[in-house]
Amino acid sequence: MNKNLIEVKNLTFKRGERVIYDNLNLKVQQGKITAIMGPSGIGKTTLLKLIGGQLHPEQGEILFDGQDICRLSNRELYEVRKRMGMLFQSGALFTDISTFDNVAFPIREHTRLPESLIRQIVLMKLEAVGLRGAADLMPSELSGGMARRAALARAIPLDPDLIMFDEPFTGQDPISMGVIVSLIKRLNEALNLTSIVVSHDVNEILSIADYAYIIADKHVIAEG
């Protein structure tokens, strides 16, 4: 049986006086694709930021491989984040540098590898998402689907244990959506990833998810 890479226990989180989560509990199995669904505005993106340590809850635990994210020092959190990749809804590519340099950025930030090796890694990751030929293009020259795939390549160069996708299908045409759905599945298997996918595109995400949670009214209301 797979162990849990993520365990959220009795999580309560507020924005001002508004309660976003009240005693929320969920688990993410290692090596699996877990879907998180629910209506807009209930804090699905907020949950990813809590798991990534960007936000702190009022109470509860968020365990990543047994470590409570909420209790880590800044240095410890920095080390843990090297094992995480995030693909936000916006894609969030740096607009003033090439696709190649976007993917290379986290490698240069977190390692001291020689440029020759960085080049090999970046081209390999671009190849994995079907963008090797776009390495020298600027983000403004990419289509919406290509930009989303470039952002995905930038999330995986350090071979993370966990990758979190925030509405990865939003704004994509049916062909691009199909490509991204299959990429998430293929990369999860090829890189032995654990994936959390936040989405309201039910058909797409359930076609690849191993487990799904539906969140509404501050709680998990269904799972399976």
Whereabouts are the PLM-identified features?
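Helix-to-loop junction immediately C-terminal to a conserved catalytic motif
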Residues: 52
